[in-house]
Amino acid sequence: MSQAYSSSQRVSSYRRTFGGAPSFSLGSPLSSPVFPRAGFGTKGSSSSVTSRVYQVSRTSGGAGGLGSLRASRLGSTRAPSYGAGELLDFSLADAVNQEFLATRTNEKVELQELNDRFANYIEKVRFLEQQNAALAAEVNRLKGREPTRVAELYEEEMRELRRQVEVLTNQRARVDVERDNLIDDLQRLKAKLQEEIQLREEAENNLAAFRADVDAATLARIDLERRIESLNEEIAFLKKVHEEEIRELQAQLQEQQVQVEMDMSKPDLTAALRDIRAQYETIAAKNISEAEEWYKSKVSDLTQAANKNNDALRQAKQEMMEYRHQIQSYTCEIDALKGTNDSLMRQMRELEDRFASEASGYQDNIARLEEEIRHLKDEMARHLREYQDLLNVKMALDVEIATYRKLLEGEESRINLPIQTFSALNFRETSPEQRGSEVHTKKTVMIKTIETRDGEVVSEATQQQHEVL
């Protein structure tokens, strides 16, 4: 596993040995004092100690926001070499070697801890990247499909609701027209019924008048019948009287004939009696014919009047029956029209109630869909904000990862440097004032602004600010 420095708070043994703190952070200049492992040669070999001081600074640049590391060698000091005839202080070298081994052991432990922390950090970064990818896919899915589908469903349902409203409006208009037509028919039938009632009343009045006339005609007929009976009785009485007179005349004629026979000298009375008889018979026949003619004329007049009255009565009765049938038919038709009107009014009320309930349901559905759309837009905006935050965190983590990668590469290159033998340690220590005067860090702040409206990205702007620390 690679070894790297990842914390600026740890206490290194470099402070005890070299007096400096090899600490670094993302926002401050990073320095890593590197020194080679000391080694002792033979007496005839020359040894030298080289101390190199590097300054590693992170410079953020470019559109991607990734930092680059720049390492510069501050200086190097080389210890004077000793010849073969010079003596070495082994006690000093031994002490330095022991302290160096202790320092390396502490560094290994610290690097192990840093490696564990770095592995945890990488796992966390991977987890955040997975969450970021899932959220990005969710945002893309919501942005690309759901709003348009919801809008299509909303428009389709609105079109269906409008079509149903138009159908119901047309049905209501048609029912209103039918109701108006039925009301007109009902008014016309009522007017016709009133006319028929008036005609019935007139017919009843005429019938009452006809009944009075019939009664008068009946009384007149009865009177005439009584008169006819009286006349018949009178005619019979006159016949009897006439017969009596004839018998008396015949008797008188017989007596006169006897007297004539007895008295031939008397004038002939037979011719006179015959003349008188013929005269009386003529008068009687004339009276009888006149009476019969008067009786027949009176009877015919009464019969004609009775027939006329009977015809009028029969016609009145027939008209009354027809009027009764018409009144019954009109009454049945009015009852049927009333039932039809009641059923149509009931259907119209039911249609109005159903239309009102469906309209309220459609309004509730519209409000619910609008609320769902607002909720989806708010959720989309929240996902976009989270996505933007995760994107910013990812960019910052990418910068830190790049920095750690550079640090790890630098540390590996430092560890893999060839170890030279040395006889004495001589290093160059730079003061904080000198390091401060030589170290410059360039800090780049990238501000990314995303404007959303109703859950959709309207504009996106990126701004970079450079600061030199």
UniProtKB/Swiss-Prot annotation:
**Which BP terms from GO are recorded?**
intermediate filament organization; nuclear envelope organization; skeletal muscle organ development
Question: Could you tell me where this protein is found in the cell?
Answer: Cytoplasm, Myofibril, Sarcomere, Z line; Cytoplasm; Cell membrane, Sarcolemma; Nucleus
Alphabetical UniProt keywords: ADP-ribosylation, Cell membrane, Coiled coil, Cytoplasm, Intermediate filament, Membrane, Methylation, Muscle protein, Nucleus, Phosphoprotein, Ubl conjugation
Q: Where is this region: Coil 1A?
A: 108-140
Q: Which InterPro entries match?
A: IF_conserved, IF_rod_dom, Intermed_filament_DNA-bd, Intermediate_filament
Q: Where is this region: Coil 1B?
A: 151-251
Q: Which residues carry this modification: ADP-ribosylarginine?
A: R58
Q: Where is this region: Coil 2A?
A: 268-286
Spell out the residue ranges making up region: Tail: 412-469
Q: Where is this region: Coil 2B?
A: 295-411
In terms of SUPFAM superfamilies, this protein maps to: Intermediate filament protein, coiled coil region (SSF64593)
Q: Tell me, in one coarse class, where this protein mainly resides.
A: cytoplasm
Molecular function per GO: cytoskeletal protein binding; identical protein binding; structural constituent of cytoskeleton
What PROSITE patterns would the database entry show?
A: IF_ROD_1, IF_ROD_2
Q: Which GO terms describe its cellular component?
A: cardiac myofibril; cell tip; cytoplasm; fascia adherens; intercalated disc; intermediate filament; neuromuscular junction; nuclear envelope
| UniProt site (Stutter) | D353
Q: Please report the stretch or stretches of sequence annotated as the IF rod domain.
A: 107-415
Region (Interaction with NEB) residue ranges read 267-414
Q: Which family, according to UniProt? A: Belongs to the intermediate filament family.
Q: What is this protein called?
A: Desmin
Tell me the gene name: DES
